[in-house]
Amino acid sequence: MSFKNRNVISMKDFSRKEINYILDTAEKLEPVARGKKRSRLLDGKIIALLFFEPSTRTRLSFESAAQRLGGQVLNLGSVEASSVMKGENLADTIRVISKYADLIVLRHPLDGSARMAAEFASVPIINGGDGSLHHPTQTFLDLYTIRRESHLEGLKIAMAGDLKYGRTVHSLCHALSLYGAEITLVSPPELRMPQEIIRDLQKNNIRIRETDALEEIIGDVEVLYMTRVQRERFPDPEEYEKVKNKLKVTGDLLKNADPSLKILHPLPRVNEISPEVDSTPYACYFEQAFYGVPTRMALLALATGVIE
C-alpha cells in the first residue's frame, strides 16, 4: 500500500484499511519515538512546519517525529516575522515553501485552508488543523491511543465539551464511524455537535445519544474524550463565560465510572479535568500526547515514500 505524495487533509479521505495500515506503521516506529532505537528513514528530507496559529504539542511532536527519523525541520517561527505580514497570500507562500521542502505541515485559522493549500503545493500537505474543520493527525493519534489502551471495534465513547468548534471531535467522529462505535455527545446546548456531522454519523448507522450531563453517562462508556471550551473561537466573550465551566471531570464523578474507563483529552486543558484525576488509572491524556510522535512519524514516512 503506497502513500507516497499523499496529502493528509481530512479523515474522510481515508478508508478503514488505510487507517489501520497507518496505525500499524506507527506501532512499528514507536520504539524509535521512545528513543530505544535509531532511524535515518528521513535522512536528506526537509519538513516545513507552517503554523499560523499557536501550537505546542502538534508542532513539537512533528519536530520530534522528523528528527527522530533523521530529517531536518524548517520552522516558520512567528507569523509576525514572515512575509504574510507584508500581504503575501497563502497560495504564494505554499508555492514558495514547496521549493524548499519535501513536505509541508500546515496549521491555519481558516476553514478549508489545508485543502486549498494542497491545490498549490508541489509536495504533500499534512493538515495540522484548519479552523474548526479538521485535525486529522490528532485523530490518528487518538485512534492509536484508543487501540493501545482499549479497543476500536464497537467502542462505547463519550465526547464532551466544545463539540461545536472542536475540530478534533469532528474528525474523530468520522473515523470512529468506520469502526461501528456507539457515540454519546455531551455538551451545553450552545456547543452541540454540528448537525451535518450528526447526519453523516446517522448515514453510517452509528448509534448517537446527546445529553448535557456527564453524570448521566459516566458509568456507560469505555472512553471519555474531554475537550476544552475554545475561547478563541467565540465571537462574543460573554458567550464563552457562560459555558466555560459547564462540564468538569472530578474524582467524585469518577466514583460511578467503569473501572476500565480511559479518559482522553487533546490538550491543552483549562479546568475541565481536575488535577486530582491525573494520578488515577483513568488518565491517558499525557501518554496520548506522546503517541503523537509515532503516529506523525508514520505519516511523514509514508507521505514522503520512505516507507511503503
From Swiss-Prot:
Q: In which pathway does it act?
A: Pyrimidine metabolism; UMP biosynthesis via de novo pathway; (S)-dihydroorotate from bicarbonate: step 2/3
Q: Which reaction does it catalyse?
A: carbamoyl phosphate + L-aspartate = N-carbamoyl-L-aspartate + phosphate + H(+)
Q: PROSITE patterns of this UniProt entry?
A: CARBAMOYLTRANSFERASE
Signal peptide (UniProt feature, chain positions)? none
Question: Which InterPro entries does the record associate with it?
Answer: Asp/Orn_carbamoyltranf_P-bd, Asp/Orn_carbamoylTrfase, Asp/Orn_carbamoylTrfase_sf, Asp_carbamoyltransf, Asp_carbamoyltransf_Asp/Orn-bd
Q: Where does carbamoyl phosphate bind?
A: R57, T58, R107, H135, Q138, L267, P268
Q: Which UniProt keywords apply?
A: Pyrimidine biosynthesis, Transferase
Its GO biological process terms?
A: 'de novo' pyrimidine nucleobase biosynthetic process; 'de novo' UMP biosynthetic process; amino acid metabolic process
Pfam families per record? OTCace, OTCace_N
Listed under GO cellular component are:
cytosol
* GO MF entry, a single one: amino acid binding
Claim: Chloroplast is one of the keywords in the record: no
Binding sites annotated in the UniProt record for L-aspartate: K86, R167, R228
Write the Enzyme Commission number(s) for this entry. 2.1.3.2
What does the protein in this record do?
A: Catalyzes the condensation of carbamoyl phosphate and aspartate to form carbamoyl aspartate and inorganic phosphate, the committed step in the de novo pyrimidine nucleotide biosynthesis pathway.
* Subunit record text: Heterooligomer of catalytic and regulatory chains.
Similarity comment: family membership: Belongs to the aspartate/ornithine carbamoyltransferase superfamily. ATCase family.
What the entry lists under PANTHER family is as follows: ASPARTATE CARBAMOYLTRANSFERASE (PTHR45753:SF6), ORNITHINE CARBAMOYLTRANSFERASE, MITOCHONDRIAL (PTHR45753)
Protein name in UniProt: Aspartate carbamoyltransferase catalytic subunit
